[in-house]
Amino acid sequence: MTKKIITLVGRPNVGKSTLFNRLSIRKKAIVHDLPGVTRDRKYTDGKIGSFEFLLIDTPGLEENPDNMGERLMGQTTQAILEADLICFMVDGKSGVLPDDKLLSNFVRKYNKHCILVVNKCEKAFDFDKEYYKLGFDSIVIISAEHGIGLIDLYDAIISKLSVEESIERNIADPFRGDCLQIVVSGRPNAGKSTFINAIINDERLLTGPEAGITRESIEVDWQYKNTHIKLIDTAGLRKKSTITASLEKLSTSDTINSIKFANTVILMIDALAHVKQQDFNIASHIVNEGRSIIIVVNKWDLVKESEKEAFQKEFYYQINTHLPQIKGVPVLFISAINKQNIEQVLDACLKIYKIWNKKITTNKLNKWLDFTTKIHPLPLQKCGRRVRIKYMTQIKTRPPTFKLFSNNPGKITDSYTRYLVNNMRDAFDMHGIPIRFTYVKNKNPYV
């Protein structure tokens, strides 16, 4: 089978060559902060799991080119014509510039599959609606230099190219330059820093009884069961009405940004403070961002033995009531200060990370769909024809996202979607992660 071709396009110095080196087997391009380092289009072989492709790096495009610029434009145009997919790159630090808008119009006229890649987003990043105005329906946020967000880019590439072959993922090193990023989040003084100190067996992070000691997200690299883990301690998330100081507003923004880039988020709850609506708000935000989540109840050693059973019963009831979208989410009860059940938390993170990356073949999905819809059929329409879901396929992982084709998608109720999602969790062992369904209409309404 002929290899698919992916071309990197963008104005100078947005990080095309850095991403080229990340995706290729060997470093081929020279990387420098000066614009215009790449003068010719460069080719290399790339590979994602079992999916191999040809990757092209192009010269940076600039408006009003001189003679050299015209020749570079010719190089880039040829690379676009050869491409099955274009990664149009912009600089997340500088935002959308006039050249980006002009060049996006130039690229889109070729009607190629495109992904907008917002690069250099290793620090706090405020997503600007201007990015949508560039006209691309698929947007991925990354840092090519630091290896952040690359798997999201890989999944977008697989989705755009409709590659349905199995992508084998090694949990210790899913792709070059990536690691398992675990963010520890929660309300202030839940014991987040103490928990990370317990894992690394070192007083690396400042702790104390005062709420709000951690003011910024702090990263700690760790190795666990041959897995490279980046532990990220965050500032506690308060209700908006209680955030007054400008520094704490910045800290909260930093925490929200860390969650966006996380693979797994540990939501830490103080057993003595009990579960509050703010905890559910944080959990909902994590799920809406599509992250996998573990709920950890800390300070379990301070709860009276006679009260623990009733506490757990009420806690599970609250979780199932307020967070039905992550049915079966792992819940662990620990004492960070006594290092009780710490390894169980890390084991749960490894397990749910694997589920979050799960890829189900189209054949298995449609056998399951046929069986499930026969057990509980969709309703009849007023015209007498039954609403049907004819076919489905997985369009991405992280979180698992599925496209379902129906003769009348508008008639599929939320309750029926919940039925399908919950049945899928049981059938494919996908408990505790967000699962997303999107419905599209069949071209033929009578099937």
UniProtKB/Swiss-Prot annotation:
CDD domains: EngA1, EngA2. Associates with the 50S ribosomal subunit. The keyword Magnesium does not apply. GO terms for molecular function: GTP binding. Keywords: GTP-binding, Nucleotide-binding, Repeat, Ribosome biogenesis. It comes from Rickettsia prowazekii (strain Madrid E). GTP 1 binds at residues 10-17, 57-61, 119-122. Residues 358-443 form the KH-like domain. GTP 2 binds at residues 186-193, 233-237, 298-301. This is GTPase Der. GO terms for biological process: ribosome biogenesis. Pfam families: KH_dom-like, MMR_HSR1. The gene is der. InterPro entries: G_ENGA (IPR031166), GTP-bd (IPR006073), GTPase_Der (IPR016484), KH_dom-like (IPR032859), KH_dom-like_a/b (IPR015946), P-loop_NTPase (IPR027417), Small_GTP-bd (IPR005225).
